[in-house]
Amino acid sequence: MSAQINNIRPEFDREIVDIVDYVMNYEISSKVAYDTAHYCLLDTLGCGLEALEYPACKKLLGPIVPGTVVPNGVRVPGTQFQLDPVQAAFNIGAMIRWLDFNDTWLAAEWGHPSDNLGGILATADWLSRNAVASGKAPLTMKQVLTGMIKAHEIQGCIALENSFNRVGLDHVLLVKVASTAVVAEMLGLTREEILNAVSLAWVDGQSLRTYRHAPNTGTRKSWAAGDATSRAVRLALMAKTGEMGYPSALTAPVWGFYDVSFKGESFRFQRPYGSYVMENVLFKISFPAEFHSQTAVEAAMTLYEQMQAAGKTAADIEKVSIRTHEACIRIIDKKGPLNNPADRDHCIQYMVAIPLLFGRLTAADYEDNVAQDKRIDALREKINCFEDPVFTADYHDPEKRAIANAITLEFTDGTRFEEVVVEYPIGHARRRQDGIPKLVDKFKINLARQFPTRQQQRILEVSLDRARLEQMPVNEYLDLYVI
């Protein structure tokens, strides 16, 4: 005899309620969070502008139906597109993530919280243009910064103690959840409607990490976040119509997220939602490289300079040893053929070989015309990683959040260079004073890729003056980026 099904509808899961209460009620008071969000905004937009240099990215942009122009539609930076908020969120999100050069959060789960800007900026611009058209006040860029801080916090706090990669799920599911909550609040949904929206995000089938790992590594990893943040806008708009939610989306026996996708485990939390994640987020400033390799690339650049001074070249190298942390080995320690740029920018051997050979690492170095140089694979074969448990412990320590790598070079003549250790990359919170000027330089370089000098200056005059930027209507700011 089968057991009777309990059909009493439960209250919303506590985890969902906490997200919604945070986006609706928490006041961001941290100056550090707003300072960081300001530079994060500029860096994220700049990453999107650089991606427009790559045809593989550009071919995915624009309306679903070519030629479609949406009245009061979202302006996609660096283009002439005028799109609905769902497709605009995909466009902006894909641009941001394409080159793996935007911010990073490392914990039990990894991710790139500025991916959420796709949905946030698209929604804010769409709302602003429609408000102006009907004689109402538009949203300001301060509201965008607030949304960014909250989306960073939701994604990052869940990621602190909960590893989705361990069960084969991609971190973009957290982009979907965070963007849904923030966008729903931005759209003016009621508490019940935001609860519904967030539950809808959790009951979606979530993206697999298949496309991030050998032997299937591919370009979906560059547009997966755009897909997630655009899905968030769609779900929030559906909830706005009164579409129902699913209260025990996480905890329902058999059918909920925990039982279906998380091996029956519940989420663990290290801290309540505040502004911790934005304050401590990592920026990729010098190199477009998967973040676990950033300090290794920095060390390799130092070693390249030492080789130059000693009259040596990469051809003289016998062996390269990388002392690293466990996450680095699990994600990017890769041998064998590398099939495409997406494969190469997730291989620490490739990302160390390029600076040892050429004294640089740029996005262009992942392309086929560079990768065909046989010296790269020859050097990759000489590079080996091994875990240092201390580096792994420091990586997980919330007071340190180190991403340490150490490289030793041994040469064919029997000599060796002293090990070069880099614990914190220049984009780390501990190196903000060094990093921010370089981050601004990166933004300026990316503006110059797309805009004439006069337009660059107009963008910079507003963008570098935070007080002025915060007061500016979202639609007016994005108008500055139209080509």
UniProtKB/Swiss-Prot annotation:
It catalyses: (2S,3S)-2-methylcitrate = 2-methyl-cis-aconitate + H2O; citrate = D-threo-isocitrate. Pathway: Organic acid metabolism; propanoate degradation; Carbohydrate metabolism; tricarboxylic acid cycle; isocitrate from oxaloacetate: step 2/2. It is an enzyme of class 4 (lyase). Its EC number is 4.2.1.79, 4.2.1.3. GO terms for biological process: propionate metabolic process, methylcitrate cycle; tricarboxylic acid cycle. Keywords: Lyase, Tricarboxylic acid cycle. Disulfide bonds: none annotated. InterPro entries: 2Me_IsoCit_deHydtase_PrpD, MmgE/PrpD_sf, MmgE/PrpD_sf_1, MmgE/PrpD_sf_2, MmgE_PrpD, MmgE_PrpD_C, MmgE_PrpD_N. GO terms for molecular function: 2 iron, 2 sulfur cluster binding; 2-methylcitrate dehydratase activity; aconitate hydratase activity. Monomer. Belongs to the PrpD family. Involved in the catabolism of short chain fatty acids (SCFA) via the tricarboxylic acid (TCA)(acetyl degradation route) and via the 2-methylcitrate cycle I (propionate degradation route). Catalyzes the dehydration of 2-methylcitrate (2-MC) to yield the cis isomer of 2-methyl-aconitate. Could also catalyze the dehydration of citrate and the hydration of cis-aconitate. This is 2-methylcitrate dehydratase. It comes from Escherichia coli O157:H7.
